[in-house]
Amino acid sequence: MLRYYGATRNLPLVFSINKLMLRASSFTRPFHYSSYSLQNGDTPDKGSTNKNEIRTPNNAVWKENIELQWQHLKKKLNELYSRFNFHRDQLSFQVNKAKKSIQEANRKLSEQENEINDSRLNYNKDELTSAKIEGLPSEREQHRKKWSRKLEFYFDSLQETLFTATRALNDVTGYSGIQKLKSSISLMEKKLEATKKEHKLFKAQYANAIDERAQSQREVNELLQRQSAWSSSDLERFTQLYKNDALNARQEQELKNKVKEIESKEEQLNDDLYRAILTRYHEEQIWSDKIRRTSTWGTFILMGMNIFLFIVLQLLLEPWKRKRLVGSFEDKVKSALNEYAKEQNMKMDKLLPGKSSEVTDQGNTENSIVEEHIEQRGECKINTAEIDRPEVATAETTTTEMKSFRDIWERIKALFVTLKSIQYRKLDAPLVFDTLEFYLYSISLVSMTILVSGLI
């Protein structure tokens, strides 16, 4: 905090450096001096009339950050839009190409039909036997059906479309770039082989130039040793050797520079080839990882679809199918038993007309058999429930009061009778489930399948 007294000494003003604001502790009139001068330690001039130096909130940093974020977002949106346009153009190109291939197939089919109907192309007379030539390809094509010929042309166009679709898939997955990299590697290998051959050639020429110059220098040295006994031919030879030595030196220097240039070029090609091969294997590894990841997600999606279909079949279709089969079976059994009862009643009426009442009672018993057959499943469930609850029964018997030994004996006998009446099922007997038990069994089976597939 800095304290400064304004126009009147009795009005102290408190200046906060952290908030960069002026706050009057007690005032009767506003303060007209600049906070900037107070921040820099300058004393304001009391006679100054500048009232526009009050510091406003600075939003430059905020605006700069917003502009940076907006520029980054705008760049991302432009890249996304350009990528979308590229894929849209590729898709439209493939669709137009497929349309053109279909139109080309239709055009070929119409041309074939016009050729069949053209009289100039229907000459089929054999000059040796004056008979008709049979088995011509056009005649065979004429006997074929139109849809078969159209299908053949469509398959021909479809083959090209499949190749184009494969190329488009490679473009989407990025394998086209890897193929271009492979072709560039093969070209670089060819260039490297040519450069090596050229290097060997220039190196041999450089060695020959060195030998020629050394030989000419030896001849010059021999001539200089017998300079006192030179003849006119020796003088001409010396002059010629001197000129050739200069030419050989120039040629040797040129060949030396070429050999150095070829060596640097060969080293550069070797480095580029090495880097290209490393890049190729790296990109192929990335591509294979992407394809493997995509196949993994595809497998998960297919597994999810299979689980969904299994749940739908087991929880919706199978109960409906079972209910329908049971209902139709019960209806058939009822109708068969009713017909059998009617036939028996008619026979008994014919044999014993006086005992019709007994026959009607027998018919009622037959109808009760049908009802007992329908309620058989419910009894089985009750029996299984009684098997599962022996502890409850024993608990109830133990909680009751035992007044005498006779009462205890009667209760034990009743317990044995109850246990004897329980119908135990064999191991190979079919299981009987109600709807809730079947749903619980299906859900547990599906959860175990998901758990096992996740562990694998």
Swiss-Prot record:
A GO term (biological process) for this protein? mitochondrion organization
Coiled coil stretches, renumbered: 71-128, 178-277
Report keywords, A-Z: Coiled coil, Membrane, Mitochondrion, Mitochondrion inner membrane, Transit peptide, Transmembrane, Transmembrane helix
Q: Which Pfam families match?
A: She9_MDM33
Report the membrane topology from the UniProt record.
Answer: Multi-pass membrane protein
One GO CC term, this protein:
mitochondrial inner membrane
Extract the transit peptide range from the record.
1-30
* Signal peptide annotation: none
Q: Mostly located where?
A: mitochondrion
Cite the ranges annotated as topological domain Mitochondrial intermembrane.
Answer: 318-435
Subcellular location field = Mitochondrion inner membrane
Residue intervals annotated with topology Mitochondrial matrix: 31-296
Could you list the residue ranges that cross the membrane?
A: 297-317, 436-456
* Protein family (similarity comment): Belongs to the SHE9 family.
Subunit structure as annotated in this protein's UniProt entry: Homooligomer. Participates in a complex of about 300 kDa.
Function of this protein?
Answer: Required for the maintenance of the structure of the mitochondrial inner membrane. Involved in mitochondrial morphology. Causes growth arrest when highly overexpressed.
Q: Other remarks?
A: Present with 279 molecules/cell in log phase SD medium.
Identify this protein by name. Answer: Sensitive to high expression protein 9, mitochondrial
Originating species:
Saccharomyces cerevisiae (strain ATCC 204508 / S288c) (Baker's yeast)
